[in-house]
Amino acid sequence: MKLGRRKFLGLGSAALVGLSLKREKKIEGSFVNDSFQMGHLLRDRASFPEAKRKEKLPVVIVGGGIAGLSAAWRLHKRGFHDFVLLEMNSQPGGNARWGENEITAYPWAAHYVPVPGPKAVYVRELFEDLGVLRDGQWNERYLAFAPQERLFLYGRWQDGIEPAVGLKQKDREQFQRLEERFAAYRNSGSFTIPLELGLSAKDQALDGLSFSEWLHQQGFDSRLLHWYMNYACRDDYGALASDTSAWAGIHYFSSREVEEKGPLTWPEGNGWITRRLLERVSENIRTNQMVHRITESARGVSVFAGDTEFQAEFVIFAAPTFLAPYLLEKFPGLHDFVYSPWLTANLTLDRYPDSRGAEPSWDTVFLDSPTLGYVDAMHQSLRTFVDRTVWTFYWSLAEGAPAQNRQLLLEKDWAYWKEAILHDLERVHSDIRQCVSRIDIMRMGHAMIRPAVGSMFSEERHRLSRLDGRILFANSDLSGISIFEEAQYHGVEAAQKVFKKLHG
């Protein structure tokens, strides 16, 4: 039985459980890292207790994702240690958090970084500091091992995610022609990482179209080509191609150097980077610190978290920008910041399931699935024999309004999502239920900013990124896309501005 997304998500938990009750062994699990209750306190303008104590220091960083950690890393490298980073959750990292069990460490969200090009100066500097890049050479241990990617389509496997099986001559010609278009945009110098180094008004018209509209206008109508473009948008932006700015869609394929090596990955995904950053700045980090108010005066900035008022000269606001109107006094509402909800899950496997004769791959995708597939945390293992593993399963809820999908995440229980995940995997791995012993699920209502049509040249975002007062914004959403390089760039830039203000 093949179910479309709407019909599938319309099934109740009982109906899904009934699909396999007779043959399923008991699978443990739960929702993990849920922090939406705290976020909803801010949304609902809840009252918080008055501060009982004060702490004075030059710099406060709000938010412990990659942007905040990168700001801390840069300050630390400059020899400046008189700052504190406040993180709402018990574990820093944001979209680069990780988990660990008796088998392996594993990612909770971002799981790789493409090999950065020469313009990504800060990322390359970081990777030199972490030992990933030495004397211009990438450490082979951190490059994804082969086989890297596989796609299941038409009852068989193929290497790579771009469809190559079942293509007609028209499909091949369109894939080739589109790659030539992307190469031309790449050579134009307007599509760069970091994004703002190349952003040019001459390409602004592309922002007024959706990516799917642009593809059709250019004469691309291959079903498999549109599936692949749509998959890319769901994977990187949490949005359908029809909801993605054409500029952003082109940027995905035209912004990176043509590089055979890569991507860079670790068992815990980008959590490995988080861990290495924490080794350097852990003394400055305060976890379980929910910031609930920020006020600014001529004397400085006060950040209220828990029972403490942190009095600072400067604040680096590295938390998602959509929180600013709920935290900062007289901060205007935001219109160009739309966020995509995601669900991720980590499945503990006591053995590998049947894969129809295929060798395990790092990244696995199914054609026409509403989900994004899974990555194998043990793929980078140097062990000669691997029997147990953890699969990290990704699902960007891209179809429909983000607010409705956030509500769906909250309304459905763990059993419902467990069945949804297993049902998707069963299309290829028929014995998956006999292999899985645990499924832990993380719900992220505002996982990443969505590069909606008309948003990439947003004056609202550019204005916030140019602010040069006591409060500096630093989240990746200032770029309109949520990728590691942009988060790190904004974090480092904000730290450098603050350091210059303090030291001249």
Sequence positions of predicted segments:
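N-terminal secretory signal peptides and thylakoid transit peptides that target proteins
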Residues: 1-15
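Active-site/ligand-binding neighborhood in enzyme catalytic cores
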Residues: 190-293, 298
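Mid-domain catalytic core of redox enzymes
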Residues: 287-392, 428
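Glycine-rich FAD pyrophosphate-binding loop
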Residues: 76-99
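Beta1/beta-strand and adjacent pyrophosphate-binding region of the FAD-binding site
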Residues: 54-65
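N-terminal Rossmann-fold NAD(P) dinucleotide-binding loop
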Residues: 68
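Conserved flavin/dinucleotide-binding core of flavoenzymes
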Residues: 20-48, 154, 160-163, 354-504
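Dinucleotide-binding Rossmann-like beta1-alpha1 core, especially the glycine-rich loop
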Residues: 102-184
